[in-house]
Amino acid sequence: DKSYFIFTNSIDLIYSIMTRLKVLDRSSVFCAPKSMDKLRQNKFIRCYDEWDKDNMRQYNFFTSRFFNAFDIELDVKPYLMMVTDVYFAEQTALDPFSDVIQIIGRFRNGVTSIEHITNVNYDLPQRSEEELCSFMDTSENVYETLRKFYDAAPNKGAREAYRAAMESLPFNRMLDRNGHKNWFAIDNYVNDALVIGYYHDNKSLHAAYL
């Protein structure tokens, strides 16, 4: 039988696919321990948190835990499929510039074919890198302005009010535990927003692949 390797970052979507296609008895899932617990609650036991080809079945599903940093060496060239459903689970959106390349790179002896099955959603925000950086700069300015008011607050009640306002701002998520700017978090925010934008329409996604 043909071997299929299917990558999608949603354990709920994986279980839905296996159920709808009636392949539960012919599938294995490679995922994080917490996801394994969820599958076992549904009486599915062929799930693993480490790759081992001895655990292969005809249909082999992988979450993002296995998108990189491990090699798949097989005597056969399987069919590679990547699945995105931006309505069901936005986290299944794959970056053609990184995720897709990393997934394909797992197969040291190549694959028979590569497919990315996806939908698009015109309601998803689509912003340029310049717009995202401008948003981040403005968010930082607003945060710093409130911090000045916080530092100059005349009493505890005022400080608590300013602190609550600061913690509600988008830029608060871009700080580390010491309150310093976290460049890694900022880069991730911008990149994730750009990737989601690719799935706004077919033309944008095709352009990202070219």
Regions flagged by a language model, labelled:
Residues D71-D85:
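A short beta-strand element within the Helicase C-terminal
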Residues N9-I11, S28-Y48, T63-F66:
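Conserved helicase motor
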Residues Y87-T112:
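Conserved SF2 helicase motif VI
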Residues D1-K22:
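Conserved strand-helix element at the start of the C-terminal RecA-like helicase core
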Residues L132-L210:
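The feature captures the C-terminal accessory region of ATP-dependent helicases
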Residues I11-I14, K34-D37, R65-F70, D85-A93, ...:
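Short acidic, S/G/P-rich loop/turn micro-motifs used as interaction or catalytic elements
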Residues D54-F70:
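Conserved two-lobed SF2 helicase motor
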Residues D25, D75-P78, N109-I114:
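Short glycine-/polar-rich loops that comprise or flank the Walker A/P-loop
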